[in-house]
Amino acid sequence: MTLFTHSIRHRITFLAVCIAACIFALSMLVSTLDSRDNALKAAQDNARLLAEREAARLEGELKRTFTSARTLAQALQGMKAAGTPPSREQIDHAMREMLQQTPDVLSYGSLWEPNALDGRDSEYAGRAPSHDKTGRYLPYWNRASGQIAVEPLVDYDKPGANDWYVVPQKTLQDIFTDPYPYKVAGREVLVATVSTPVMVADKFMGVVALDYPLEGLQKSLSEVRPFGSGYAALVSNGGFYASHPNDKLLGKKADTLSPQALE
């Protein structure tokens, strides 16, 4: 074998080794990238499953709470449709009892169209605490002071502040408002309102509503720690934070989240 032949063979062998090394390195790189992608996908899948599980749990809790407003609305519309509307005092008693039995609810309230309840608004004009000067029945049973008490609903004719009334009035559907701050026992808490229409013969009569403080929900979600260092947040249908580890973001627009995160 000549020196030239030996040199060529050596170079071919060296080149083959280099190619093999490059192929091995590329294989390792592809394998690493695949592993990283698989790990990322697995993490995303796990996070989505956790979110779906928590969402289902919260949905169940909220449905149980909100059913009370719908149940009262259905009872009132049933009696009204039968021609035996309950007295205002009976409705007051029912809402007070409901509030006592649902400690996680801040308040129950009801507002009827003029003379829609019993045609006696003029008799009740200015008779506090369940009426204002119009005589419309508009009690607001609440525990904002720390004790259960009733006062007349306000701002029901103020645009923006009366969505809990005008939206069910127009859509004939329930509404769950975006969170907003409200003072309870001297301190400000985040609250959402659920309002359901009272319908008789397909005609809007009024609403039954409840205010739900989001503190309990906030505390429950604060215990959810995906992968030990993550956090869970709840965004309302209107795109506002109903729950977030950063209290400063509560009730604020969730405009930093990606569209995928809001799906």
Predicted segments, located by residue:
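Conserved beta-strands of PAS-like sensory domains
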Residues: R187-R225, S236-N237, S243
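Non-catalytic regulatory/interaction regions at protein termini and inter-domain linkers
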Residues: M1-R9, N38-K41, E123, K133
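Hydrophobic residues within alpha-helical transmembrane segments
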Residues: C18-I19
